[in-house]
Amino acid sequence: MSRVRQLLDKLPWYTDNIHSILMYLIMGGFTTLINIVTFWLCTDVLNWDYRIANTIAWVASVLFAYFSNKKYVFESYTPTWKEKAREVSSFFGFRFLTYIVDFLVMILLISGLGINELWAKIWTNVIVLILNYVFSKWIIFKVRK
């Protein structure tokens, strides 16, 4: 346990649930930053199509998200290969589901409504962040008894 966590744990209102949400917001912020910066680099610097850029940004951010969520947000411990396989497959499976939501909303906002690519990316990240938290908290990293 980190020194920061030890200090925060002394606060009477600081619970494990608050810690989990706070860490998710911090790690989710980094994940979102990776996603948006990667998307921006691909679209504005490399001049790639937004659909390709969105896919590359998704891969980069999901890889970061898995390790940061496992270690810092949900503090998941999977001692057996079977548990590790279940956790990894459910994480990437649900992230792929939210990627489809992301992709479809991006097409709707950009091609359908004519919204700026970067603004569309920011709005879809809000939707995806909420969905990913719900899936991670109650399905993927759920404490098994």
UniProtKB/Swiss-Prot annotation:
Pfam families: GtrA_DPMS_TM (PF04138). One of its GO terms (biological process) is polysaccharide biosynthetic process. The keyword Membrane applies. GO terms for cellular component: plasma membrane. Keywords: Cell membrane, Membrane, Transmembrane, Transmembrane helix, Transport. It is a multi-pass membrane protein. The chain crosses the membrane at residues 21-41, 52-69, 96-116, 121-141. It is found in: Cell membrane. It comes from the Bacteria. Involved in the decoration of cell wall teichoic acid with galactose and glucose. Belongs to the GtrA family. This is Cell wall teichoic acid glycosylation protein GtcA. It comes from Listeria innocua serovar 6a (strain ATCC BAA-680 / CLIP 11262). The lineage of its organism: Bacteria, Bacillati, Bacillota, Bacilli, Bacillales.
